[in-house]
Regions:
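Short helix-terminating capping/connector loops at secondary-structure junctions
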Residues: 46-48, 73-79, 107-114, 138-141, ...
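Polybasic, glycine- and aromatic-enriched phosphate-binding surface used to engage nucleic acids
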Residues: 299-483, 489, 493-502
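S-adenosyl-L-methionine
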Residues: 97-135
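Catalytic micro-motifs at enzyme active sites that drive phosphoryl/nucleotidyl and oxygen chemistry
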Residues: 71-72, 107, 131-137, 228-235, ...
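Class I S-adenosyl-L-methionine
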Residues: 1-78, 83-102, 127, 203, ...
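Conserved acidic residues
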Residues: 50, 144, 379
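Glycine-rich, acidic and aromatic/proline-enriched surface loops and short helix-turn segments
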Residues: 7, 149-152, 442
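Signature of N6-adenine DNA methyltransferases within the class I
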Residues: 22-23, 27-36, 57-64, 79, ...
Length: 505
């Protein structure tokens, strides 16, 4: 059935390409991706009938994949009710032809009756017009299985589509998110929905409302990640632009299953990762997703997550640098003048060492505003935004107050974060600062943060939650690193890995 739909769709693509020079291939789901999406749906082999929704059906490739799987794996199922929404006139004839051929194949090969409904309408705006009348009320049609690879166009905030879906706050929103919101409303209790969404759905701050609404209505159950090529072996593996999310209408599972592939989802190249706790993958506050991309990633996350301490429990805090250049015009100087204090910029962070002064401009600030200066204390500095040339995601350096003994106060630039004591009157001990730096400069912590980070920069909120070993272990590592008098990643790894019982490859 799936082969039939894909073969016929290929003919349509070739015809349009020749006659109208329209390239439609990118609009349709690849065969292996369709089979993968259908496989992510849970099926009950004892069930005798299924209702299926394919919203934005195109030529029926996803419909074919679901119907084929039900027929093959559910011998008790004798009836399938398929509903398709499609309003593209180029696709409708092929959709109807494919479904009719599939109907005959179901009857002939599997003795299954396939009942077909095709709505030549916009799913987002018109689905509310199709409902079931009950004794007490009329409710919108609901389905046991929903599968959807939506179109990619953008809708304005005041468009009819955004209005029907509701809860849209951004100026523009992609159609896939509106399709997902509508699909969540059309799920029966215990139903499953598998939807292709842009990878931005996992963490984009503008989609917080979307994720929270989905979290309230349905529970995430499975995730498939399409992995891109890794240009820098020392940086995190990149995601391609789409991910597949599988939702269920019911209680959240204890574990979420994540799988990955480098292609369109062929079985031989798909890797299933060890299941992860639901509360780890799905953030309780904003619904954002943490997405490990390999078995090694899941091992690192599982190991680090069990450490007992955080910055707060150690009496520490992470803050963003105080100075933004555009707000301090007239206060910044390239050379030291009377009343000015050093301004530590991200260029000072180099190879684990904080170097000052540097051959850069505007590295001193006049101490005229108390909100722009801080006490000269031991700190760990972190680049907020890694440069493309950086080999690591997390770039940190150790700063000792004794480096600038003639200054009681210094300042920090907004493009760095700094770790300091919560108590303004106290100071981090040298061994604690060096131990913390050893952890942050190690390979395993760089990997961990690149896995759990939901943005391309170091987020102080994520750093506050960073699991850390007990204080005595951190201080012990700090003393050993101080004795080694080195700040390289290799030196930190030589101390951190044996201490934390991490076995290197």
């Amino acid at each position: 059935m799936l082969n039939l739909a894909v073969r016929n769709t290929g003919k349509l693509v070739r015809e349009k390409s020749k006659s109208e020079n329209i390239r439609l291939g990118r609009l349709f789901t690849k065969k292996e991706t369709a089979r993968l999406m259908a496989a992510m749906l849970r099926l009950d082999t004892e069930r005798t009938a299924y209702t299926v929704l394919d919203a934005g059906a195109g030529t029926g490739i996803l419909s074919a994949a679901v119907i084929e799987r039900i027929c093959r794996e559910c011998p008790s199922c004798k009836q399938i009710f398929i509903t398709c929404y499609e309003n593209n006139e180029d696709f409708l004839p092929m959709l109807k032809d494919n479904l009719e051929r599939i109907r005959k194949k179901c009857r002939h090969d599997y003795n299954v009756r396939l009942y077909i409904t095709v709505y030549e309408e916009n799913y987002i705006t018109e689905s509310k017009n199709h409902y079931t009348v009950t004794f007490f009320d009329s409710v919108e049609d609901k389905y046991d299985l929903i599968i959807c690879n939506p179109p990619t166009e953008l809708y304005e905030k005041d468009s009819q589509e955004a209005s029907e879906a509701g809860g849209v706050t951004q100026v523009k929103i992609g159609a896939p998110f509106l399709f997902a919101k509508m699909a969540a409303r059309h799920m029966e209790d215990g139903a499953d929905a598998v939807i292709m969404l842009p990878a931005t759905a996992a963490s984009a701050s503008s989609l917080t409302g979307f994720r929270q609404e989905m979290k309230e209505r349905v529970s995430l159950e499975r995730i498939h990640l399409f992995i891109g090529k890794q240009k820098n072996a020392k940086r995190a593996v990149p995601l391609k632009k789409n991910i597949i999310l599988s939702y269920t209408k019911g209680a959240a599972p204890e574990k979420i299953q994540i799988s990955t592939s480098y292609d369109e989802g062929k079985p031989e190249s798909t890797v299933a990762l060890p299941p992860l706790d639901y509360n780890f993958v799905v953030d309780e506050a904003d619904g954002s997703l943490t997405l490990p991309k390999s078995i090694e990633d899941t091992k690192i996350v599982s190991y680090i997550s069990h450490f007992p301490e955080t910055l707060s429990s150690l009496g520490l805090k992470i803050s963003t640098g105080l100075v933004i250049d555009s707000r301090c015009e007239g206060l910044l100087f390239s050379e030291p003048i009377k009343g000015a204090v050093p301004l530590l910029r991200q260029s000072c962070i180099n190879g684990g060492v904080t170097t000052f002064p540097m051959p850069v401009k505007r590295q001193y600030i006049a101490a005229v505003n108390p909100t722009l200066i801080q006490k000269n204390k031991n700190m760990v500095l972190i680049k907020r935004v890694p440069a493309k040339s950086d080999e690591r995601f997390l770039n940190s350096s150790i700063y000792m107050a004794a480096q600038l003994p003639s200054y009681r106060y210094i300042s920090t630039h907004n493009k760095i974060n700094f770790i300091d004591t919560k108590d303004k009157l106290s100071e981090m001990s040298a061994r604690l600062a060096w131990g913390l730096f050893a952890l942050l400069n190690s390979t395993i912590y760089d990997r961990y943060l690149s896995i759990v980070s939901k943005s391309k920069q170091i987020n102080s909120k994520e750093m506050k939650k960073l699991p850390l070993p007990p204080r005595n272990i951190i201080e012990n590592m700090g003393m050993r690193l101080m004795a080694a008098k080195q700040t390289t990643v290799a030196a930190c790894d030589q101390i951190v890995n044996p201490t934390l019982h991490i076995i290197e490859k």
